[in-house]
């Protein structure tokens, strides 16, 4: 039951982020399962949600040999969308 509730929160958060991204002209797809949701934005840009926060990969730490992630509270989907949109723009420039 807890997984269903947290999964529902994750999906609702992801859909709110998707809507805010759409207002910024950034298309995306939402997928959910196993208590999590993800917003697929661009090649190499997937935003995960657990219903409490969003997180996405922003780079690679060569020293620690691992990805670097940014995160944002899911209570602020508009601000998170602006940050994701900036990342999207930087990836498209490559």
Q: Where on the chain are the PLM-derived regions?
A:
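Negatively charged, low-complexity tracts enriched in Asp/Glu with abundant Ser/Thr
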Residues: 1-38
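Intrinsically disordered, low-complexity regulatory segments enriched in Ser/Thr/Pro
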Residues: 44-74
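Ampiphathic alpha-helical segments that act as solvent-exposed interaction surfaces
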Residues: 67-94
């Amino acid at each position: 039951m807890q997984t269903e509730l947290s999964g529902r929160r994750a999906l609702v958060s992801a859909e709110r982020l998707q809507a805010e991204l759409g207002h910024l002209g950034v298309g995306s797809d939402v997928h959910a399962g196993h208590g999590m949701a993800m917003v697929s934005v661009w090649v190499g840009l997937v935003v995960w949600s657990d219903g409490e926060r969003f997180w996405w990969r922003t780079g690679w730490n060569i020293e620690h040999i691992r990805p670097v992630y940014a995160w944002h509270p899911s209570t602020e989907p508009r601000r998170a969308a602006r940050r994701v949109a900036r990342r999207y723009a930087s990836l498209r420039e490559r």
